[in-house]
Amino acid sequence: MAGNENGGELLQDAVCRTLAIEMLDGKWPAGESLTLEDVQNRFGISRTVAREVAKTLESMGAVTVRRRVGLVARPFSDWQALNHQVIEWRLHSTQRERQLSSLTELRLAVEPAAAASAARLASIDVKAKFPVYAAQMRQIAESNEEGAAGLTKFHDLDVEFHTLILRESGNELF
């Protein structure tokens, strides 16, 4: 499958994203169905690509695939909410605020435990990096560097810092 105009995104991924966002936005309500032929015609894709779309959405709990019926939308409570694609789709839907809230709550539950474990288990060399990251992030925040550059620098450091904590926690699920 070739990429498309969406930055090299696979066609089947673009179709999955579109259909998932429609479900999340309530445009394709739970319980309603689309045939594979509907998907093919709407997106101008082959039956093979439409089947891959169906398999992908089904693997994430977004649809049930039924013979002679097609793809039946499922309620969000059935979806694989921790799947990175599902999270991304929600962030691009009308569910964005709810997804951000859920992610914040998850971080508040996990990060203190990860930090406590990292404080116990990390080497002295790794522990010495923690205040360095904090100082660098504070410096960027206090510099009031405007625009995307300042935000990008802060975000990159924040991701590195939290990745280090999670990795050093000793819990492979973090």
Where are these regions (language model features)?
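Short linear motifs at protein or domain termini
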Residues: 1-110, 116, 120
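Conserved amphipathic alpha-helical segments that form helical-bundle/coiled-coil interaction surfaces
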Residues: 103-174
